[in-house]
Amino acid sequence: MKPAPTTQQELLTRAQQIAGLSFAELADEAGMTVPPDLRKDKGWVGQLLEWHLGATAGSRPQQDFEHLGIELKSIPISYTGKPLETTFVCVAPLTGVHGLTWEQSHVRNKLSKVLWIPVQGEREIPLAERCVGYPLLWSPSPEEEAQLKADWEELMELIVLGKVAQITAKHGEVLQLRPKAANGRALTEAYGANGRPIKTLPRGFYLRTQFTAQILQRYYA
């Protein structure tokens, strides 16, 4: 892995230098093997980019470049530049959430400054041939932060009330809560409506595609 960048500009320059390169070229330099597809290797693209950019946090709650206060997010896009899938932000806390505020939340920390790296995501393009796009450094506008905060507070209120099982992907305008587990056996603790502990699937916060589409549109229009 390349050493961690020491400044925001160094990170941005690195990201600009890999723009236009294919996954095959980037994997070759990193000594990584390109999988046939991403069905069993969902995190492969992120790991490839982390290697080239010197990210250190992995999937821990901290930002990928904690010393710079920057989170790295790859975003698969279509031929027309639209996001093809929702963007995972972080795992949602299901216990010990009484009194937790938006300002203290992992979601706000992760999204305070994001280095977005668009990547070709159309399924018919072989993975090795897909290319990395031009990066953008983004922080939420006051309006975007207000949207995120409102959704986060609505979802967290349902968790606090023991209604986690009633939350669907339809909740939230820009931020949604969905099960996040490699299989249905990976259960975690939460609270039921009667306040007693229950076992449920881990949940993750995800950004809706219309939200990330607006970010991309504003920067690349």
Swiss-Prot record:
GO molecular function: DNA binding; endonuclease activity
Domain of life: Bacteria
GO terms under cellular component: cytoplasm
Recorded family membership: Belongs to the MutH family.
Organism of derivation: Vibrio cholerae serotype O1 (strain ATCC 39541 / Classical Ogawa 395 / O395)
Known role: Sequence-specific endonuclease that cleaves unmethylated GATC sequences. It is involved in DNA mismatch repair.
One record GO biological process: DNA modification
Localization, UniProt: Cytoplasm
Name of this chain's protein: DNA mismatch repair protein MutH
SMART domains in UniProt: MutH
Keywords annotated in UniProt: Cytoplasm, DNA damage, DNA repair, Endonuclease, Hydrolase, Nuclease
Presence of keyword Amino-acid biosynthesis: no
